[in-house]
Amino acid sequence: MSKNVVIIGTQWGDEGKGKIVDLISDRAVSVVRFQGGHNAGHTLVIDQQTTVLHLIPSGILHDHVECLIAHGVVLSMSALLKEIAELEGANINVTERLKISPGCPLIFPYHIALDNAREAKCGKTAIGTTGNGIGPTYEDKVARRGLRAGDLLNPILFASKLKEVVEYHNFLLTNYYGTAPVDYQVILYEALSQAKKIKHMIIDVTEKIHQHIANDENILFEGAQGTLLDIDQGTYPFVTSSNTTSGGAVTGSGVGVTDINYVLGIVKAYTTRVGSGPFPTELIYNVSTNKGDAIGKVLGTVGHEFGATTGRQRRCGWLDMVTLKRSFNLNAVTGICLTKLDVLDSLISVKICVAYKLNGKEVTIPPYDAKGYTDAKPVYIEMPGWKTSTIGTNSFDSLPIEAQNYIHKIEQLANLPVDILSTGPDRTQTLILKHPFE
């Protein structure tokens, strides 16, 4: 019997979702992206060759896998065509296997201009977006003025809609933000030129998904970013503009709630965050000055914690079970995939946050707002480290006993099994204890 599996990041993103999607998508007929845009970066390492994907589903490296970009994704045609060219330059067949929903909101230069103008105006209080126009594009979608991929199929109507939207956003850019306007004719010409290259990929993605379900075929839904960046459930306002939880797979692709059979929650063995926002277990280290917490330096250096999309330094800290348990509930996680265990290999001891001290009380339920997270002080348990390499370990029993104990403690606190264990960046450096499609 087939399964529909959702892969979700349970922290602030960068948990290692891309590698796991690539790993288990060999069992799937189709891989579906359902939210976000090219602000996400999924890094795959296969036979020591690194591929970074931003829009195209991570199943693209398997020749038999169909890759679907559903209507919950905001689409930059420029970013998509660049990614296609890079993959096809590496002899990977993309255009015959990639399909795009007509409902995908399109990202244009005025979205990027607005994104950057807002961040500049906010100054030190800026959220720290990727500057790719994601937020303004979702705003246009909700305001019902956005242009979608399906509009490209009617160039005359597209041009008319675009003119109206450009006038609106140019008013904002010039009169509120005091920045230069964008050129309608330049945007129109570029968009229609790009449309010629992607129009043949635009199909009813939702119907395609339901055909696979009717045919009893495995489907993998690939989440981007992480639960704590969810527009509704994350550390608002330091969040992204889409629903990054498993519920987003339903609304962002058009399947029903009961169509989902298994949710794999990706958990990094420590915690990272890019950009601004509260981070209770952060071990502050600044790579540019080489000053700060020694453990934070180890996590960032050994873990190569720099954003795949922006190149920015990721902030690092201990594993936070307070936020994770909330994430597991929000996503109805079935099993855990624990990644980057090997980054902890050199540490004498490891810590897990099991509660917060907030307003003089010890709490195990996370606060609802960013200020509460900022005020929260972590309460840790400390466990012995293993000081032995776990990279490429080929069985659970061959792990150091201290590493096994760390994993078992996570399972105990989460009340969930660790079904997959990643012990290195390469596809082969993974222990599958229970396959999500079985």
From Swiss-Prot:
Where does the UniProt annotation locate this protein?
Answer: Cytoplasm
Q: Which GO terms describe its cellular component?
A: cytoplasm
Any one Gene Ontology molecular-function term assigned to this protein's record: GTP binding
What Enzyme Commission number does this protein have?
Answer: 6.3.4.4
- UniProt keyword Ligase present: yes
Is Nucleotide-binding tagged as a keyword? yes
Question: Which pathway does the record list?
Answer: Purine metabolism; AMP biosynthesis via de novo pathway; AMP from IMP: step 1/2
Signal sequence, start to end: none
Reactions mediated catalytically: IMP + L-aspartate + GTP = N(6)-(1,2-dicarboxyethyl)-AMP + GDP + phosphate + 2 H(+)
Residues bound to Mg(2+): 14, 41
List the cofactors.
Answer: Mg(2+)
Q: Name one Pfam family in it.
A: Adenylsucc_synt
Quaternary structure and interacting proteins, as annotated: Homodimer.
User: What PANTHER family does the entry give?
Assistant: ADENYLOSUCCINATE SYNTHETASE (PTHR11846:SF0)
- Give the protein name, as stated in the record: Adenylosuccinate synthetase
| Species for this entry | Vesicomyosocius okutanii subsp. Calyptogena okutanii (strain HA)
Q: What is the lineage of its organism?
A: Bacteria, Pseudomonadati, Pseudomonadota, Gammaproteobacteria, Candidatus Pseudothioglobaceae
Chain's gene name: purA
